[in-house]
Amino acid sequence: MEITNEILERVIAGKAAGEHKAYKYGSDNKIKGHIKATLHDLEQSKNIVIETEDSYGSGYASYVDAFCYKPNGRSSQVKSGTIYIDGIAVYLCKLAPVTVMGTMGKSRSSSGGSFGFLSAEDLNTFPPGDWLEIEAEIRKKLETHGFAILGPRELKKPLSFIAEIETNLGDPPFKIFDAFFHWMD
């Protein structure tokens, strides 16, 4: 997908953009259905477990976060009663048929847990160990559903215009990443 200023301005304004029919002609429900079908396809894999988040409290996220990790504890460690899970975060944009992925870790304990957020610098990085097959499977399924998988080369670039983006994830001057993947509490 070619990233134009028109597309960036639309997604910053909260409007759908892109050539995929769900985004070009569809309503919010069609876009949600498209993302749901994509996640369902990912969930069918025997190689990964998927946990999804599409909101964070009372805020708004311009993307759905899918955390993918190996089943049966194969990407987990337990230290001092806390479970640490290595995986791949996949962000599916709700405003354009674009997605990103990169290394993510989560922790869980009896008192709660923690996780982070991807930034433009984290893209196309993967956890240590054997993840190539899983990465390839995720990529294939995302591309089958019409998502363009963007990387740091495209998304680390600054916006070519001044924009106001309500986000807790970045500060001005904003990057192309911030236009597609923003969250505000």
Please report, for each region that a protein language model flagged, where it lies by residue:
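Acidic, proline/glycine-rich low-complexity IDRs
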Residues: 137-185
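Extended, charge-biased low-complexity segments
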Residues: 2-144, 149
